């Protein structure tokens, strides 16, 4: 049977864990402290929205995405809305097939079913060459559950990784800039996503010209200011929608003058409309 444990009080999660992965049920606002694992892992929110913070940036993981965190990367989680988080650890041989940095992928129907199978009643019972060998979020790593045999578990994990290799990386990982001036602007955008100050105006606050900031954004993040601010706003929008707010409220709270502009930007990044997203589609 899986190890049932109540997570640390600050985390607020009820967890089922085994050597190759686990399942965490978090109330809205729950989360984990900073941690790192010896093996890379995938996290998927079967329900709710998960925010994954790493040293390199922040990833939003809604129900149609999966986030990859390489071995040794310090990270922490936070749930928005009641969140059912699934986690699968990968062996070094499989981890080498994925990026060497945090990434977010769109989840195909097959990948979703494999993730649910590996972390459901039958999954997670074996630690073979293509499985994992570390506990989940500070768990003791014991208590394997009966389920798939070693060979079947290995095949499922290989299918999952191949599905992710075929999937496009999604722009839901928000990298942290290195430059102090960009970091100051990042704090402003994150704290007040409805702020409509231009890049030139923000530059005056941090002591840099719009031209300098544009160059830094291109060099450090590979995006324009418009793309960066839109991504920050969509991150915030996913959280608000998970907390039960409608599209109109969310649009204005995130800085869009009208819902249609918000819907277009949201759909472009997330792959579905805010309404369908709230409805679970």
Label each residue range with its predicted role:
Residues 99-117:
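Aromatic/histidine-rich interaction motifs
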Residues 56-71:
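Short acidic-glycine-tyrosine-enriched beta hairpin
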Residues 196-200, 208, 219-263, 279-281:
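Terminal helix-turn-helix DNA-binding modules in bacterial transcription factors
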Residues 72-102:
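Ligand-binding loop in jelly-roll beta-barrel domains
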Residues 64, 213, 217, 261-262, ...:
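Short hydrophobic/aromatic patch on the recognition helix
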Residues 124-206, 219-231:
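Short, Lys/Arg-enriched, Trp-marked, Pro/Gly-tolerant hinge/linker segments that flank
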Residues 1-50, 59:
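Generic protein-terminus/edge-of-domain signal
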């Amino acid at each position: 049977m899986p190890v049932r444990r109540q997570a640390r009080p600050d985390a607020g999660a009820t967890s089922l864990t085994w050597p190759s992965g686990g399942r965490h049920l978090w109330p809205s606002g729950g989360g984990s402290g900073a941690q790192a694992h010896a093996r890379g892992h995938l996290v998927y929110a079967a329900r709710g929205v998960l925010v994954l913070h790493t040293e390199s940036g922040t990833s939003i993981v809604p129900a149609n995405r999966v986030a990859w965190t390489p071995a040794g990367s310090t990270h922490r989680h936070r749930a928005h809305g009641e969140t059912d988080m699934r986690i699968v650890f990968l062996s070094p041989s499989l981890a080498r097939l994925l990026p060497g940095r945090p990434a977010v992928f769109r989840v195909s129907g097959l990948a979703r079913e494999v993730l649910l199978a590996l972390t459901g009643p039958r999954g997670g019972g074996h630690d073979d060459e293509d499985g994992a060998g570390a506990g989940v979020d500070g768990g003791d790593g014991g208590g394997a559950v009966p389920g798939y045999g070693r060979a079947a578990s290995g095949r499922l994990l290989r299918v999952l990784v191949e599905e992710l290799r075929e999937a496009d990386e999604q722009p839901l990982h928000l990298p942290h800039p290195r430059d102090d001036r960009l970091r100051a602007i990042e704090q402003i955008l994150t704290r007040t996503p409805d702020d409509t100050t231009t890049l030139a105006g923000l530059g005056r606050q941090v002591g840099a010209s719009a031209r300098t900031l544009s160059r830094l954004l291109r060099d450090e993040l590979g995006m324009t200011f418009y793309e960066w601010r839109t991504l920050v706003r969509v991150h915030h929008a996913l959280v608000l929608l998970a907390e039960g707010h409608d599209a109109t409220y969310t649009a204005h709270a995130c800085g869009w003058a009208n819902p249609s502009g918000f819907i277009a930007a949201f759909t472009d990044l997330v792959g579905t409309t805010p309404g369908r997203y709230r409805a679970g589609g």
